[in-house]
UniProtKB/Swiss-Prot annotation:
GO biological process: mitochondrial electron transport, ubiquinol to cytochrome c
Organism per entry: Cephalophorus niger (Black duiker)
Subunit structure: The cytochrome bc1 complex contains 11 subunits: 3 respiratory subunits (MT-CYB, CYC1 and UQCRFS1), 2 core proteins (UQCRC1 and UQCRC2) and 6 low-molecular weight proteins (UQCRH/QCR6, UQCRB/QCR7, UQCRQ/QCR8, UQCR10/QCR9, UQCR11/QCR10 and a cleavage product of UQCRFS1). This cytochrome bc1 complex then forms a dimer.
UniProt binding sites for a ubiquinone: 201
Job of this protein: Component of the ubiquinol-cytochrome c reductase complex (complex III or cytochrome b-c1 complex) that is part of the mitochondrial respiratory chain. The b-c1 complex mediates electron transfer from ubiquinol to cytochrome c. Contributes to the generation of a proton gradient across the mitochondrial membrane that is then used for ATP synthesis.
Protein name (Swiss-Prot/TrEMBL): Cytochrome b
Keywords of the record: Electron transport, Heme, Iron, Membrane, Metal-binding, Mitochondrion, Mitochondrion inner membrane, Respiratory chain, Transmembrane, Transmembrane helix, Transport, Ubiquinone
InterPro entries: Cyt_b/b6_C, Cyt_b/b6_C_sf, Cyt_b/b6_N, Cytb/b6-like_sf, Cytochrome_b, Cytochrome_b_C_euk/bac, Cytochrome_b_N_euk/bac, Di-haem_cyt_TM
GO molecular function, one term: metal ion binding
Record-annotated membrane-spanning stretches: 33-53, 77-98, 113-133, 178-198, 226-246, 288-308, 320-340, 347-367
Amino acid sequence: MTNIRKTHPLLKIVNNAFIDLPAPSNISSWWNFGSLLGICLILQILTGLFLAMHYTADTTTAFSSVTHICRDVNYGWIIRYMHANGASMFFICLFMHVGRGLYYGSYTYMETWNIGVILLFATMATAFMGYVLPWGQMSFWGATVITNLLSAIPYIGTNLVEWIWGGFSVDKATLTRFFAFHFIFPFIIAALAMVHLLFLHETGSNNPTGISSDADKIPFHPYYTIKDILGALLLILVLMTLVLFSPDLLGDPDNYTPANPLNTPPHIKPEWYFLFAYAILRSIPNKLGGVLALVLSILVLILMPLLHTSKQRSMMFRPISQCLFWILVADLLTLTWIGGQPVEHPYIIIGQLASIMYFLLILVLMPMASTIENNLLKW
């Protein structure tokens, strides 16, 4: 008799995705981040659900309800900090996952890659709306500044912003709708992640060499299930270390002050995972130009398959491209640092140079390096 996992309509799907899936025999730890992102998402949905049971989306009580969760709810503090720091772990995994895709040329799987970019946008939107919910100073002013950027859109800008706000400023209507969206979005992300996986399984996984691995496949279980479990344990170890030893390390002290529309904090800045994009936004002295640069800094990922000029898929055997890739990583770290600094000399010029460097590397230098490598190999 055939095993039930191969015949049952539901188990068959699980079997083909996680058990009998033919996987390349040489995928490294950089291929662990997909499963880690899945774990992060499940963790965020569960902790978020329990937080939503005690949270109230009202301007007068939101801040107090978060305090109440931390002080009075059984293990509320750990749920709250797991959710807040879980978002940071989520973005660390996301950046690693995208970086892996860029390095090993995974973007040549067009459908998988494009859904991935949509997932990145959706996750960023969700995190932004979640940051508004505790209704601290940085929540309120972050929401005001970022939503206000839409007013740079010609003709419809102002109407669009007021429509999103549900009034003439960030207020009760804004908070309630952000809570509603923040609750629904993770489920949309989960659905998109399943589509992401569906498209990936149409082609099979890429591998570090970028060469077809059809001649050398191994079953996903037990080899990669055990590898994913190790990754998950390390993820939970790092997360719980953060939560139990320094839960506020990545947060902003201003968010422990209740939102006050009459008092602007001296330095308005988003969470650390948005700082690179915030630095690019601030480096352009024009409002519309800044907004366009901000959107393009992420949207440029969609162009990656078009900018791929190399005859090889992966960067494994391309030292010049490797060098430029790590310069890009260093550039993004520089932008992240600049995004958290005040707008004054010398930070302004550093931010502008780093922003120019970012687009120059992706749009010009990396495609050029690929062409040079082709010529060096007489291809």
